[in-house]
Amino acid sequence: MEPEKQTEISEFFLQGLSEKPEHQTLLFTMFLSTYLVTIIGNALIILAIITDSHLHTPMYFFLFNLSLVDTLLSSTTVPKMLANIQAQSRAIPFVGCLTQMYAFHLFGTMDSFLLAVMAIDRFVAIVHPQRYLVLMCSPVCGLLLGASWMITNLQSLIHTCLMAQLTFCAGSEISHFFCDLMPLLKLSGSDTHTNELVIFAFGIVVGTSPFSCILLSYIRIFWTVFKIPSTRGKWKAFSTCGLHLTVVSLSYGTIFAVYLQPTSPSSSQKDKAAALMCGVFIPMLNPFIYSIRNKDMKAALGKLIGKVAVPCPRPEQLLDVYHVPGSLLAARDTEMHPIPYPGGVQSLAGNRDME
């Protein structure tokens, strides 16, 4: 069969995580719960940073952006997966497929760049504490963030434009639960040599640069910390970067565990596992990691929740219900006995000693 032109293709079909009907309810419940926790957790982090002036620092500025990117990354794949499970359909429009691929690589790569920028922030805070406010001023933070968005957007745009030039067979099934770059290339009937070269080039430059930056930053951080004479000083220095190091270990540990293995027929399952961990579960865990041992963040979250919580009524606010004179409320050993009467409910204040 002749492959149809890409412009004539209306949709692809996603293989999903499981084709067994008995698994669909479990998958829907699990990923809906995960997605709701991700949205609520990251939204609380974002609102806490916005509303608490004590968190208006470079470190929390980058954490704000990380929470935003994690929310967008999870929203790229999970809602469509839930919709397909609910509708018992595996179809995704061709344009929607390219859009999903663009967004996933944009936010996924941006996540790595933000982790690298946060490593630079921790490097400056520990190695050059006296110059921290000068080196990490607002223009510098804005420049680091803007450059990261520009590079990641350029990479995703080039991948998407090159993919749009390829031809595919109608009714092709993507061996994944969302539209990813490599599974789409495997379905193309065109020459993908250019695409593969671009993927390799970006993998070397964009893929390894954030990790190299993180690695070099922490080598310098550890070298500086080990020279601190007191154990308390070392612990205090390590505590400022421990949470970030936990997230980095989760992210890159997953990638290394999945891809630094011999190629096997189950490579598509490895791709799914890595995508689930990096695109679904780590964005859900990040708010807990950054708040559970962070006193400043816990205090900000406490203030935020206190503002939105419904306040309990004070005793004097109940006067309109019980019609008790204020002077009696000040008396000791008194209690109120609501009794019915034709017009409604009234109360009498009685002294226990007189009963």
From Swiss-Prot:
GO cellular component term, pick one: plasma membrane
Disulfide bridge partners, by residue number: none
Gene3D superfamilies: Rhodopsin 7-helix transmembrane proteins
Residue intervals passing through the bilayer: 26-49, 58-79, 101-120, 140-158, 196-219, 237-259, 273-292
InterPro entries: GPCR_Rhodpsn, GPCR_Rhodpsn_7TM, Olfact_rcpt
Record's subcellular location: Cell membrane
GO biological process, one term: signal transduction
Key words, A-Z: Cell membrane, G-protein coupled receptor, Membrane, Olfaction, Receptor, Sensory transduction, Transducer, Transmembrane, Transmembrane helix
Molecular function in Gene Ontology: G protein-coupled receptor activity; olfactory receptor activity
Cytoplasmic topological domain residue ranges: 50-57, 121-139, 220-236, 293-355
SUPFAM superfamilies: Family A G protein-coupled receptor-like
Record's bilayer topology term: Multi-pass membrane protein
Family membership: Belongs to the G-protein coupled receptor 1 family.
Protein name per the record: Olfactory receptor 1I1
